[in-house]
Each structure stands twice: as structure tokens, then as C-alpha cells.
Amino acid sequence: MAFRRQVKNFVKNYSDAEIKVREATSNDPWGPSSSLMLDISDLTFNTISLSEIMNMLWHRLNDHGKNWRHVYKSLTLMDYLIKNGSKKVIQHCREGFCNLQTLKDFQHIDEAGKDQGYYIREKSKQVITLLMDEPLLCKEREVACRTRQRTSHSILFSKRQLGSSNSLTACTSAPTPDISASEKKYKLPKFGRLHNKRNVCKAGLKQEHCQDVHLPTETMLSQETLPLKIHGWKSTEDLMTFLDDDPELPLLATPPSIVSPITCLSEAEEVCNLSGADAVPTLSENSPSGQRDVSLDKRSDGIFTNTVTENLLETPLEKQSAAEGLKTLTILPACWSSKEEFISPDLRVSKSDSTFHNQASVETLCLSPSFKIFDRVKEIVINKAYQKPAQSSIQMDDKILKTTTRVSTASEGASSFSPLSMSSPDLASPEKSAHLLSPILAGPSFWTLSHQQLSSTSFKDEDKTAKLHHSFASRGPVSSDVEENDSLNLLGILPNNSDSAKKNISHISSSHWGEFSTQNVDQFIPLSCSGFQSTKDFPQEPEAKNSISVLLREVKRAIARLHEDLSTVIQELNVINNILMSMSLNSSQISQSSQVPQSSEGSSDQI
């Protein structure tokens, strides 16, 4: 059909306006496009093109029979031109009013027995009503004018967005200029007023999108809302931008929730079981200097709580309420600065930046790279710049060691995180560190939990008890009398680098935690190491294997979480599928029930 129409256009030498009218009123089984009708309406403002358009329309309206689509599409195009075209179109239509009156009796039944003339009769009645009712015609033309302005604005807006994206790709460093930013700033109040008049806007949109059928009883926009809508509601893109620019309601500040220790430890145990390895983190690589700087920044995987109370323990810890949960004692030297505290020459903890986030979990504690410094003593290696020749005696000055407690706010059983392994800054030599750790390990009533076998200790959380199989250090009661004797004279305790002292040092494996007790030492350090040796004694191959194993654990954990997410998505899709199936069944039943009365009415009419 299209090829035949093109040949006919070429043979009869039709003008551009006539070709467009013929295409809009063709015999194709679809309606004319809005862009084509818009072009034809623009041509009506030209006198020559207007006469050509109207002559072709009247010629198409005189068709009958199988060319009933010519008539219907001509009425549709005429209705569009009356609303959007020149006012001279209205004069031409009123001059041929009698031709429109004859179309009210148009009859045509196709081969399938369907009355196709019904739509032509109804459309002709609408056009005649529009031509006779002057106020209705004015309102329809105003609505069409606003629609046209909004459409043109949306086209310009899309072109501006395209130009800005092209400039962004051309120069990525230059910021993209937002042309309509000032307009959005001043149009927001007007958009708020339009939002209050929701019903009026809905009525206008209904008329703009359904231009083929316009009933006189439809709700029309008042003259007062015309400038508001022209300036405040230019396109749907502006509406979307306004919604994006609206300030969000402030969320209620909720205190950080403390994760239950049993739940956290159970999750960590599952991760350990999946990976088939220990939960104790290992160092990924050895740096050339052997130094590690740990800075507890404000990250999403922060572990330590910022509710640390630096108060001396004046009463035994057994008398405290069970609702406060378990607390971990961490020994902090009194000579630390306000901003940064040096736990050892290699370990630096920023006190001002350490925070607690409710997103933290024991899994991140076990597998986070920032805590790999606490795995083994061999990795907490003093830099060569701090190393000093071995001395015959090492004496530690009197330093008051303050104890701090991390208080958990959860009403249930609260959990304490892994304490830091700390030593004095004076312990500069790796050879002396082994001798200095043996008296420090022996703390009064301090004990640490076993890493793999911890069946004797349990947390009481209402009626539930769970055994902990992880390397989290706990603490025992500390008396106030012991705190008075904080000074430590290592000269009287340790011999001068003798072989007997080296033999007496207990080598604690990385999979067990020891239990120590002495009389007058107010300090403990949980250790998980295979031996007190320098980094030169340890090969680097096992550490590389450990780093690979840690990465494999993280990959396995990510895959497991992805599998869980996919399973939930599949379940939701199944639910949606079931709902859609039920809706389709209901619609089919309704259609069948509606067909039954129609068939009964048809039989009664035949009777």
C-alpha cells in the first residue's frame, strides 16, 4: 500500500502538504502519528498549504464503502486541526458543515459483520458539537496550546541533556552546566500549588492524552491555573526533577544496636566451618621493615565502641549488674597522648577516630585486614630503627597503668571484642621481648579463653546458652589492692638473657590460649603465636599461604551471601508469578461471566 501511494503521489505530482494528508488518512490499519499531524497543523498557517490540506480532506471525507478508514482518519485529522491549527481551519469546516452532517448517517458493515460506520458517526457528532459550541472550542484550543508548549519544552530539555552529556564525555574534568537549575529553583513553589490542585491537573492530562474523544461534560481547567501550569509544570522531566530535589524527611536517630554475642559468634563459627580453617586472622604479607600501623578510622566495619569509660575499677566486677553484659579489660599506658597512642613501636591506635558502628560483626573482626596485626607476636616486630643492643638489665620505670572498660548498652548479654596485644615502648629489642612477655603474661586472676575448645565458658542470654569456640579474650575480677602496686621492676624478675630464661618461656600455639596467674602484676596480654621469635626465624611461604586462605574465606563468604540473595529473589519471583496467574484466572472468569449475559440477551432479541 505504501509503495502504491508513493507511485500515485509521484504520478499526480502532489505537493508536500497533500502527500502528508494522504499519508495521515491512508487505508492502513493504524491511526495517524502525532508528529505527522503536528506537521500538518503547522502547515495550516500558510495560506497555500491550508487550501491544499482542506481540499484533500474534503476529498477523503467523500469516500465510502471499503475506504471507510479514509473517512474516519480524515475526521480525526480535522478534529486535531480545529484544536491545534490555524483559526482559518474552523472557517473552512463551518463552510462545509453540510458534508459533516451527512456523515452522521454513515453506514458500513465489513465482511466480518461488524458495523464500522458506528465510529464514523460518533466522531462526526463530536466534530459538529465542537464547531457549534464556541466556549468549548476555546477551551479545547487552550488545552491544545499548553500541550504543544509542554511537548516543545520536553524536546528542548532532552536536547539540552544530550548536549550536556556530550560535553561531559568531551571533557570529563569540567563540570556539566545545568541550564535549568535557576528555573527549577523558582518554580518549586508553583509546583507545590499545582500539587494541591491534583484533580484539576488530572482532568487536564486526561484531555491531553485522549484527544480523539472529548466529551462536553469533562472537567476543564480554569483561567487562573493557566499561567501556573505553563510556568510551573512544563514537562514530565521537570516533575521528576522536582521530586528528586525535594528534601527527604530526617530519619529518627536510633542508638547503635549491639549485636548479640551468641549470634555473632555463631556466624563466625559458620564461616570457620565453611572455610575449614581457624578463625584467627593471619597477616597477609611481611613488610620489609616489619612495621604495622593500625589506625581505627570511621569505617563501616569499625569494631570498637566509643563508649569507653576511663574509670578505675574500685569495686569487684562480680557485683556489677548482669544487664551491663561482659566487659573486656584493656590496659592502656598512662603516658599516651590525647590524639595518638603508641601501644608498641609498630602498633599505633588513633583514639579520637575509633568509633563503633552497628554494622559491625564478629565476622569482620575475624577476617578484616585491619586486625591481622593481632594474630601473632612474631608479626608485631619492632623496626630496625628502634632496635638496641642487648643490655644486661632492663628496668621499666614506674608507670601507672590505667584500665578501661568497654561497657555494652544491650540489655541482653553483651559481647566484648578481641583485646589488643600491647607492650611497653621500651621493649625495643626482639630478643628482649620474649623475656619481658613472660612476667606480663602472668596476670592476677586474668585468664583468656581457648581458641578451639572453650566448653567450660558460656554466655547466659535469657534461657539460651551457647558455647564459644573463638579467640575472644575475657577478663576476671581485679581488686583495688592490686591496682595500687602498678609499678613493675623487671630487673628483679628477669635474668640477663640467660639460656634458662629462654627455656622457661612457654611457647603458646596459635590455636590455644593459656591461663596465667601471679600475685602482683596488673597487666595481661592475650597472645596467639607459635613462638617468641624475630621475623628472621620465620619463613615467608606459610604467611603467603595464610593470606591466600584469608582471601579464599572472603570469597566463599561472598558467594554464600550471593547465593542467599538469589534464593530470596527467586522466591519473590515465584510469589509474583502466582499472583499474576491468579489475576489472569480471575479476569478470564469475569470475561466468561460477562459473555454469558450478552449471549442470553442476543437470544432474547432473536426471539
From Swiss-Prot:
Name of the coding gene: ENTHD1
**Sorted UniProt keywords:** Coiled coil
> Tell me, what is an example of a GO biological process annotation in this record?
endocytosis
Q: Which residues form the ENTH domain?
A: 9-141
Q: Name one GO molecular function term.
A: phospholipid binding
**Coiled coil: is it a keyword of this entry?**
yes
| CC annotations in GO | clathrin vesicle coat; endosome; plasma membrane
Q: What is the name of this protein?
A: ENTH domain-containing protein 1
- Coiled-coil ranges (or none): 543-574
PANTHER family tied to this protein: ENTH DOMAIN-CONTAINING PROTEIN 1, EPSIN/ENT-RELATED
